[in-house]
């Protein structure tokens, strides 16, 4: 059952701050914590310029786990905290093999733009010059967000 008041207490105001890095884990998955932040902000409308869905980062997580954006949003809407959301993510993921999850996490951490889908590469071609400092090189996909949001 949705509990937007509880969601508001957990939500970061993304008009004033950044979501967590895609490198931060939730439930053993990179990208998970960032998805939670963006979804929690989306529900009460304090997501600013951040999209919960569609999002290429979230798409990677949802594709790997087999969880849909709507399923994730329904759980977040209950006011689930990080621990509860992590437990749900672990239980609902189609991937239960810990070694496969570790390998996927490492693949995501090392993912280069040239390895991304063509539409993501095209999007990043315009996005990076607008939002990433020109003197900072992007080595892997996660760098785009960590540079833009001043974590690197």
Model-found features: residue ranges?
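Polar/charged low-complexity regulatory segments
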Residues: 3-49, 110-152
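Amphipathic alpha-helical packing elements
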Residues: 47-89
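Amphipathic protein-protein interaction modules
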Residues: 72, 76-129
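Short coil/turn linker and secondary-structure boundary residues
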Residues: 2, 30, 53-56, 67, ...
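Broad hydrophobic/π-residue packing in well-ordered secondary structure
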Residues: 31-32, 61-65, 69, 93, ...
């Amino acid at each position: 059952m949705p509990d937007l008041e509880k969601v508001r207490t957990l939500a970061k105001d993304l008009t004033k701050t950044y979501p967590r890095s895609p490198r931060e884990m939730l439930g053993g998955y990179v990208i998970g914590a960032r998805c939670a932040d963006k979804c929690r902000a989306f529900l009460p409308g304090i997501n600013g310029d951040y999209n919960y869905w569609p999002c290429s980062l979230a798409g990677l997580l949802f594709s790997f786990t087999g969880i849909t954006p709507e399923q994730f949003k329904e759980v977040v809407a209950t006011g689930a905290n990080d621990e509860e959301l992590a437990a749900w993510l672990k239980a609902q993921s189609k991937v239960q093999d810990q070694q496969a999850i570790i390998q996927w996490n490492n693949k995501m951490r090392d993912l280069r733009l040239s390895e991304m889908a063509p539409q993501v590469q095209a999007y990043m071609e315009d996005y990076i010059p607008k939002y990433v400092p020109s003197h900072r090189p992007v080595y892997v996909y996660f760098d785009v967000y960590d540079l833009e949001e001043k974590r690197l």
